[in-house]
Amino acid sequence: MKELKKIIEETYENKNKINLNNLDYEILQTIFRVIKLLNNGIIRISEKKDNTWITHEWLKKAVLLYIYIKENKFIEGSYTSYYDKVPLKYEKYNEKQFKKEKVRIVPPATIRYGAFINYNTIIMPSYINIGAYIDQGTMIDTWATIGSCAQIGKNVHISGGVGIGGVLEPLQNNPTIIEDNCFIGARSEIVEGVVIEKGCVISMGVFIGQSTKIYDRENGKIFYGRVPAHSVVVSGTLPSENRNYNLYAAIIVKKVDAKTLGKTEINQLLRNIK
C-alpha cells in the first residue's frame, strides 16, 4: 500500500505535466488498482481509528486523477443512455453476483464505479457518487444523494430526498460521515464534513453544515460539526445576541440509548417531544 500511495502522491504533484496520450503504464495501472480497491471496499477514504476519523488524502488524489485521465464514453442503460468518464458500478454484474453480495438495487438507482456497497443493503432510486462507502444493513431511500467520499455506517436509514454532502476538494477537508445505527429523516441535508455519531435520529428537514449551531437543550451546550451519539435532533431556531431576531439551529431535544432505540419506532421518538 505504501508503494501505491507513493506513486499516487508523486503523480498528483505533477498532474499538470501528465501526457494523456502517453501515460506511463505503471501510473495508469496504479490509479486503476486504487479505484478498484475502493470499489471493493478493501480500502476507504476515511476510517475510524482510536475513536477518531482519519481521512486519507492520497485516496482522494487517486479519485481526482482517475477522473482526470478518463475520457467520456457511451454507457448503455436498459431505458436510457449516458455519456460520462466514470462507469456505473454494476454495469457488468449478473444475477449471480447480486445474489452473492445480497444487495438490492432498484432502478433507476445510479451508483458510480469506485463506490462501495456492503452486504444486505437496499438502494432505492437514488444517486451514490465515487468514493462513497455504504456499510451493511443500510437503506438508501428514493431520491437520496450520497456525495463523493461520504461514509455511511451499518444499519443506517437514509430517508427519501436526503442529501449527504460529498467532498473531493479541498483535499484537506473531511467527508460527511453518518455512523452506525442512525436514522436521517426525509429531505434533510448533512454536508461539509459533519459527523453524525452513532445511534442518532435526525428528524425530517434538518439542515446541518459546519457553521450550523447544534444546541443541546438539556445542558445548553452548542456543538459545531458533529452531533453527539444517541441524539434526537429537530430543526429550530436560537435568538440572536441582541434578541432582535432568531437564526436557524439544529436542536437536540433528547438522548436515546441503543436499547430504547431498538424497541421504539422512530416516529414515536419524534412525536414524544415536550
Swiss-Prot record:
Q: What is its main location?
A: cytoplasm
Database matches in Pfam families: Hexapep_2, THDPS_N_2
What SUPFAM superfamilies does the annotation carry? Trimeric LpxA-like enzymes (SSF51161)
Where does this protein act, in terms of pathway?
Answer: Amino-acid biosynthesis; L-lysine biosynthesis via DAP pathway; LL-2,6-diaminopimelate from (S)-tetrahydrodipicolinate (succinylase route): step 1/3
Taxonomic superkingdom: Bacteria
> EC number(s) on record?
2.3.1.117
The record's listing under InterPro entries reads: DapD_Trfase_Hexpep_rpt_fam (IPR005664), Hexapep (IPR001451), Hexapep_transf_CS (IPR018357), THP_succinylTrfase_dom1 (IPR023180), THP_succinylTrfase_N_sf (IPR037133), Trans_hexapeptide_repeat (IPR050179), Trimer_LpxA-like_sf (IPR011004)
Disulphide-bridged cysteine pairs: none
What Gene3D superfamilies does the annotation carry? Hexapeptide repeat proteins, Tetrahydrodipicolinate-N-succinyltransferase, N-terminal domain
**PROSITE patterns in alphabetical order:** HEXAPEP_TRANSFERASES
What keywords is this UniProt entry annotated with?
Acyltransferase, Amino-acid biosynthesis, Cytoplasm, Diaminopimelate biosynthesis, Lysine biosynthesis, Repeat, Transferase
**Family the UniProt entry places it in:** Belongs to the transferase hexapeptide repeat family.
On assembly, the entry states: Homotrimer.
The molecule here is called 2,3,4,5-tetrahydropyridine-2,6-dicarboxylate N-succinyltransferase
Organism, by scientific name, is: Buchnera aphidicola subsp. Acyrthosiphon pisum (strain APS) (Acyrthosiphon pisum symbiotic bacterium)
Q: Which gene encodes it?
A: dapD
